[in-house]
Amino acid sequence: MQPFRTLHSTVTPLDRVNVDTDQIIPKQFLKRIERTGYGEFLFFDWRQDPAFELNQPRYKGSQILVANKNFGCGSSREHAAWALGDFGFRCVISSSFADIFHSNAGKNGILLVKLSEGDVNTLLERAQKTQGYSLTVSLEEQTVKDGQGFSDSFEIDAFRRYCLLEGLDDIGLTMRYQDKLDAFEKEHDGKFWLAPRGGLAASRTS
């Protein structure tokens, strides 16, 4: 997972409330478990409209999505985070997020920034009116700035912040303790009453 420290990017505005996960990635595309290949189906139904934001050349290559409140509601599908990341978004800014989506996004390297409704509306308006409108999001400083006078700070769980800064998903975090895991297995491998038949090492590779 790519570490997230400071991101400077143009902004894609999505001025819609209650954007649910079925709109983010419709159910007919949830037929595999790989994390890649979903970007082309992001907001699939809405992208049938030529006027939809993601179809506009001015927003091409944007890595920051600014959306209205209650983003990511609906089902718990992790594919929603996969689709956003595969499309190229590394940060989503909104005034509120659904809890499960919030967890899924962070575990997949996407920084979710919660700002006030007033500040989100300001960013939406500026992104809609200003060609090439950009933001700088610093996870290290926990700030959002646009170089035009807008500046705000945001809160984030300390553990999630650490994982994003280090580029660690759940597996990567676990693998940092590989030496301790190996030592535990070695220590307990001879205690047959605690291990499956063949020992801990055998059970892990079976």
UniProtKB/Swiss-Prot annotation:
Heterodimer of LeuC and LeuD. GO terms for cellular component: 3-isopropylmalate dehydratase complex. One of its GO terms (biological process) is L-leucine biosynthetic process. It comes from the Bacteria. Pathway: Amino-acid biosynthesis; L-leucine biosynthesis; L-leucine from 3-methyl-2-oxobutanoate: step 2/4. Catalyzes the isomerization between 2-isopropylmalate and 3-isopropylmalate, via the formation of 2-isopropylmaleate. Its EC number is 4.2.1.33. It catalyses: (2R,3S)-3-isopropylmalate = (2S)-2-isopropylmalate. Belongs to the LeuD family. LeuD type 1 subfamily. InterPro entries: 3-IsopropMal_deHydase_ssu, Aconitase/3IPM_dehydase_swvl, AconitaseA/IPMdHydase_ssu_swvl, IPMI_Swivel, LeuD. It holds the Pfam family Aconitase_C. Keywords: Amino-acid biosynthesis, Branched-chain amino acid biosynthesis, Leucine biosynthesis, Lyase. This is 3-isopropylmalate dehydratase small subunit. Disulfide bonds: none annotated. It is an enzyme of class 4 (lyase). HAMAP family: LeuD_type1. CDD domains: IPMI_Swivel. GO terms for molecular function: 3-isopropylmalate dehydratase activity. The keyword Ribosomal protein does not apply.
